[in-house]
């Protein structure tokens, strides 16, 4: 969750408290991901706590709807509620209550921030809109991943780095995403300046059944199995999205982009998402990870 300080969490020592007493400000987020093989009742579930007494005291209800061609959806900034822009509606959207839809697709998030130069100030889609549109449009966790990837590719991603928890009745996925910054380029056809790096880089990993996971405002994906067309695929392989053996999905140019930006210069097999895009600092290592 984004807070106004852009910090996942903070600590201070209190003058009148006992020595070494720490107080943790609770403007932060924590998610836990539990697969059906690890739960008592055999169900998948995720938790999404904003760790704050002033946020998310209500649930929003969006009814299912059919849309005529040309219908547009307003994109509101999650932090300010300002209108960011508009995108076309699909033919049908699903009912959503809070962060779960009628198909039992559920989402949660925590903000890890990452390299600030990778925020696209002109990116239309912020992290909140990305979550709600994924819920409105998806019938499974895997479909939600594709929808999120397609939306930021087409319209740009305008938020900090995020970790998403994505679940349905059968699977639980863990996804990390960060923008590609803003590189202005003049487009002759449009007669306008565009972002040559519009979009985002991301990795999604399925949590094995019988396991649990968690995240709390720190990027946790390091190295991962690279594309083999079976266990691991990229966005160039969407036709294989629903193959049961697929456990990893990632943006096809993620390593090339990191090299171009100077974030990584090793062998492909050694590529580390967190080290490249959100290097661990004190807060992430000692305070954010402490919560999970």
Residue ranges and their predicted role:
Residues 2-3, 11:
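Acidic/polar hotspots within intrinsically disordered regions
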């Amino acid at each position: 969750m984004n807070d106004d300080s852009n910090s996942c969490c903070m600590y201070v020592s209190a003058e009148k408290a006992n020595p070494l007493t720490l107080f943790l400000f609770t403007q932060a987020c924590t998610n836990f991901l539990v697969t059906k093989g690890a739960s008592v009742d055999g169900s998948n579930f995720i938790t999404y706590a904003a760790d704050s007494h002033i946020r998310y005291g209500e649930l929003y209800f969006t009814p299912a709807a059919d849309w005529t061609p040309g219908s547009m959806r307003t994109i509101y900034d999650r932090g300010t509620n300002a209108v960011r822009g508009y995108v076309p509606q699909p033919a049908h959207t699903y009912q959503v209550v809070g962060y779960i839809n009628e198909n039992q697709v559920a989402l949660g998030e925590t903000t890890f921030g990452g390299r600030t130069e990778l925020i696209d100030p002109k990116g239309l889609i912020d992290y909140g809109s990305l979550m709600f549109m994924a819920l409105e449009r998806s019938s499974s966790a895997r479909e939600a991943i594709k929808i999120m990837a397609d939306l930021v590719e087409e319209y740009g991603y305008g938020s900090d780095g995020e970790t998403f928890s994505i679940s349905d009745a059968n699977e639980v996925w863990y996804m990390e995403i960060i923008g590609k910054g803003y590189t202005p380029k003049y487009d002759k056809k449009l007669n306008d300046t565009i972002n040559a790096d519009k979009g985002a880089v991301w990795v999604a990993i399925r949590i094995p059944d019988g396991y649990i996971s968690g995240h709390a405002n720190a990027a946790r994906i390091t190295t991962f199995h690279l594309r083999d067309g079976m266990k691991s695929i990229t966005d160039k392989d969407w036709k294989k999205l629903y193959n049961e053996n697929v456990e990893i999905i990632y943006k096809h140019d993620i390593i090339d982009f990191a090299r171009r930006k100077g974030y990584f210069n090793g062998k492909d097999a050694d590529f580390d998402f967190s080290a490249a895009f959100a290097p661990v600092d004190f807060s992430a290592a000692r305070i954010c990870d402490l919560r999970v």
